[in-house]
């Protein structure tokens, strides 16, 4: 059968991986797809590298706009990244009636609503398995595998850099700054790591999963985002003593009031499978009302793991590209006319449990004052450690886990506790999820 | 849009779950599928229970053959189980041009080749996500999510009963017989547990995954099957001391010589995520050449988890049922004309590592004799425990882990070791997989 022709935009890490996996496994992929999938043209600014990688097996150009207008191209694979030129290219490809496969989470999180509307109007597919959690087929699981369910929540370790850093901080008892340098040396963190360590990358991915899970429009601009750069190794240790592990989770949850959409360091019980996802690995835990909890685990980044997702999309599009649009899986899992506009909840309205660490003067009555304030806000305490002060030390630390409460209540309590004479310095507040 | 009409065969546990999840989440499912999915007729021998469960919302009958011939039925859902009447019904439904959704692993493992050929000829779909690992969308992951990959191997905990029993044996230090009775009391094991505890159920599921992974025809009749009924609690303890956990794994692996297809108790390193899958949960670890290892975890049985998979298939079939067959995902992942016939390897040719436990007379020279025999077969030792004999005891135990070797070599060595004067009783031999 006639091969399908792919125009590849960008042959960096993921583009290079896609090119080489297609070459290596092309025969087996064709046996699955029903026809060969071939890269017919590659656009990249670095023509010399592009020629070296493609070895005359296809055309090369430095003009990406020529590729999205090329009449011989059936599917455009956008692996340039960023959300300016990439957006123009994707919209132009759609306008030209091309199907698009992309790994660009920033683009979809910010401009997905516009892009999917354009694709819908033109009757083309925009596939994006590679945009979330690399090679793990989590988009497929959410959009197709769990269609029977009312999805209740999703909690994911969806940034390998931060998970690597947290694993190392715990294992070796080192500080964030020291481990970040090590991660940069090993290539697990970028020279400018802000995007990863401050949780922005995770929030992009979370926004995409949230839209698909709830049939809601993409709401990245309303996500609450906290990273791990302020996390103290002492809190990782105390959490362990209490039976918890700290992970940077992306959490989205449907409540009767709206949708929670938040990325922040989170205590989770050590006995949960997801608490044991170590190093640069990714995992997504999904709670559906019928299936219960399911978990998806694998490499969330890297050339070939991400290429695995790009090519899975290519096979899907190859199978479906001549079919009526009605036969295809909707871009955001729900039919375009069946999307809803659920409000994203402000963090003050989120209900969860909390870990608090207070530095206090070592004298009687302090604990009574603190617990009185918590009780006034109807916050009850689940567990507590009071560190024994060392010989001659006049201050000590109290660590508490609370039961569930609304974030505005804990914040009100913290303000009052911080104003107590006996309380010294800032109060550490981390969120805790049981994930049951 | 016009609803799609489902004929449900069997309204027991899974049928009842399917009926009630469709009722509860029908509106949300229609928003995904693009049209309502409604059960229009249910066939079950127990008419009274059927009427009670369906509450006049659809027709009921005790004649399943009438349903598969019913012109108003678009999709037949077969949840009767077994492989005699169910086979006739499925083949009849296909002959009548109906699409089929089934959870029947025994039927597909034994008669899948015939059923898929009939469906292919007639241009209908046979969907079977629910046949493997309950609500975990593992069939979709293998058939669609990982299409870029040359799949190297799959290792799965795909029987909840046995995983529950092994978890309890380890946690509580109890024997198989005691825990089995407890599992039966809790409803985790059938009154006749043979099918589960002897590994047959796991082998059915493994055969289906193996065919999909490698594009091979269904080869259940050649699977090697060992259960857990002979497993001694002592070996679970020794394995723990050595850093391993014992799980009943279904393993299928592509080698240059053929396909390994085997179910047996297996030692796996405790630090692997899959080693920490406890109780009745299921998990499948898949190694692809591009994506690396990915893991899928969730409930492998039960009314609603299995219904989740049945209904996901119903949504897929609903979307695709008027599309050209060429647009659909092939039944066994590879196009029918691109299937191969890889040989299934006899166990003697399988290469893996081993755990050995020997009861020996407590005297010098025994260990030298044993290691000499292993060396003669080119088997090297990775770790060893020699239990200190108690005061006055004349026998002791030696536990060894070997490096990889061919099964015929270890068996030859065991025969020679067993004939040594100093070796008392049977030698325990378990297989060990690193799963990397």
For each predicted feature, which ranges?
Chain A
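N-terminal glycine-/serine-/threonine-rich beta1-alpha1-beta2 phosphate-ribose binding loop
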Residues: 1-96
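Rossmann-fold NAD(P)-binding glycine/threonine-rich loop
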Residues: 85-96, 105-143
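Low-complexity, glycine/alanine/valine/leucine- and proline-rich hydrophobic stretches
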Residues: 264-289, 303-304, 375-393
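Substrate-binding/catalytic subdomain of NAD(P)-dependent oxidoreductase enzymes
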Residues: 178-276, 281-283, 302
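A short hydrophobic/small-residue beta-strand
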Residues: 99-101, 381
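A conserved regulatory-domain signal marking ACT and ACT-like small-molecule sensing domains
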Residues: 309, 314, 318-436
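Short, ordered loop/turn segments at secondary-structure junctions
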Residues: 45-47, 65, 105-107, 113, ...
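Rossmann-like NAD(P)H-binding beta-loop-alpha module
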Residues: 120-201, 208
